[in-house]
Amino acid sequence: KVDGIYSDYSNGEGHPLNRDFYVPSTIAVGASDDDIGGRFDGHARQSRFRLTTNTPVDGGDSITGVLEFDFMVTKGDYDNERISNSYLPRMRHAFLKYKNWLVGQTWTTFMDVGALHESLDFIGTTDGITFGRQVMVRYSQNGFDFALENPETTVVGVGATDDNSVPDVI
């Protein structure tokens, strides 16, 4: 996938992260004398590679394995758990699934994947949606999920970022 993006900022460019991701807390607001003109970015970083395996085991069950990655990560201070939980190239999903168990990294259990909007261009999620991929151990049955996930908290502007010593229980 190849992207060509032209941006014109009326209130200043704001945070460099905005050129790759939609993060509302980093958008420049208010009057600014910064007339930087337009910016053009072209890349193929949203191209994805996915490998899915389905291995039969005794009893008619199977073990499913998924490995998916892309290159959609910004270099520098932003290639961290807040954005991708990985580094260049960016690992999106890497998990094994057997019966009701899932072990690895995929969409957080706290996220409603069905609420994601259809979009040709990945700009992130709409405001108010929990969005993230976490390392986890998850058990699912009859519409109920129980998971132990990577503990990562980011609350912008109040200094409440934290890495806990115990996993998130969802």
Task: Locate predicted features.
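Outer membrane beta-barrel
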Residues: 1-17, 29-155
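Acidic/histidine-rich helix-loop elements
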Residues: 22-23
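Surface-exposed beta-loop-beta
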Residues: 157-170
